[in-house]
Amino acid sequence: MGHSSIQRIILLILDSLGIGELPDAKEYNDEGSNTLNNIIRDRGSIHLPNLEAMGIGLIQGVEGLERVKNPIASYGRLAEASIGKDTFIGHWEIAGLIINKPFSTYPDGFPKAIMESFEKEAGLGFLGNKAASGTEIIKELGEEHIKTGRPIIYTSADSVFQIAAHEEIMPVERLYEICRIARGIADRHNIGRVIARPFTGAKGSFRRTERRKDFSLAPTGDTLLDKLKANGFPVTGIGKIGDIYGHRGLTHEVHTKDNMDGVDKTIDALKGVDKGLIFTNLVDFDMLYGHRNDARGYAMALEDADKRLPEIIGFLKGSDMFIITADHGCDPTTPSTDHSREYVPLLVYGKRLRPGINLGTRKTFADIGQTIAEAFGIGRLGHGDSFLRKLTIP
């Protein structure tokens, strides 16, 4: 059943922790992006002793962190082979699926053909249809929505089709139903996510509720997760992992409130699951700090996560492998509030794995997926080269 000595793998995604622009960053308007280095430079210093002990300061391009003499983990960085820089494409590539066709974006609103399909299939009109901030557009169109009953449709720099409706005008279940109809249309146009955005309140005090729901494009091919599940391995997705993989290839899905809850749930999984993959995404770095250009908040969130690493390591057995990486960048110090096209860190720890190996610059995030596939003996994924032997051969 795979590489005899590894029974369980913990894969932790520090969402958006890029470590320097990729060679093609200028094609994405991301020249000068370096999420980690720029956060440290902005603040003057950062306290990440546990990531430093693992060797993050030794990774090519990382500056301002201690270059420890004897790291407890092996280290490197990964380039993205797919076209794009979003969460889905990054995570799918980690799991062995490379995407060469970017998701569609509509900075000027959705074309007539898409909106006509929506009106016909959903059986109702709409308001909006432009790129906008969600809080601003409900201020602008909320009252008209209440008068007409028409949902508010808007997008952003990302590949999203967002539908906002007042909970008293359109019950949430009906909004979800309309989103499912929109998901069918979005599938035909390669749109990453349809998002239900319910809100409540009166004019002047509209506010979004926590009943947001994402309807995501499922991976367009098999991933590591599908193969693991088909081979009888438990696959636990913590945080937004379920949404990212279209709720496929998972045996357990665990939702989280925030990063610290994500760490708690990861530790719960370590106590409860003795084999297979535990796959956690800590999204706050990206959602709360990267997109909002809050470098100080990002730095504090990194310090909070770093403090918890010894707890995770404390629950690891000799037959575990612990991998830390990211899915893209989101540099809070650049004018852009969007993701950035960057290298991501690679840290690999195991009580029985060789520490201090420089795994170099890997050509694709898929090297992680292929390493996990080899460790569990499930054969080749579509892409990626395993680095397992570098860590296991004495």
State the predicted function of each range.
Residues 1-394:
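Feature captures the catalytic ectodomains and active-site-proximal regions of enzymes
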